[in-house]
Amino acid sequence: MNLVIWDIESSSANTDFGSIIEIGGILVDENFKEKDRFNLRCRLPEGEIPQAMALIVNKTSIDQLTKVNLSHYQMLGEVEKKFKKWSPAIFLGWSNIGFDDEMIRKEFFKSIRYPYITNTTPNKRHDGLNIAR
């Protein structure tokens, strides 16, 4: 089964109030040979105020939040297409069960997309932090 290693950067540490502003992923086969990759960045959704500490942590400038061509909705559409294309796979990240999965579920739900794409049949998920523990 293929493995998707993915991560997000967000406008807040709170999954209820923040938005994904950047997401990237790498698709590898069972021998860890890279098959595909993507990295997308979008504008901050209109009316949202980013958390200053989140921007410091993910090294995002105000220009990056406002002058990118891709809208937040368009970015989520591209992510959905990519994840569907890469399925079936095991989705893996670092601390992603506690944060990234929650964030993408909420974002997909708000944009009327299927929110459980990373962990329902035929896909599975795992967390690198849990492996390390």
Task: Show which residues each predicted segment covers.
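Short, well-ordered alpha-helical segments in soluble proteins
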Residues: F83, F108-I112, A132
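Substrate-recognition/cap helix-loop segment adjacent to the acidic, metal-dependent catalytic center
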Residues: F99-K124
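Short alpha-helix plus adjacent loop in nuclease-associated cores
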Residues: N123-R133
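Conserved non-catalytic scaffold segment of RNase H-like nuclease domains
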Residues: M1-E107
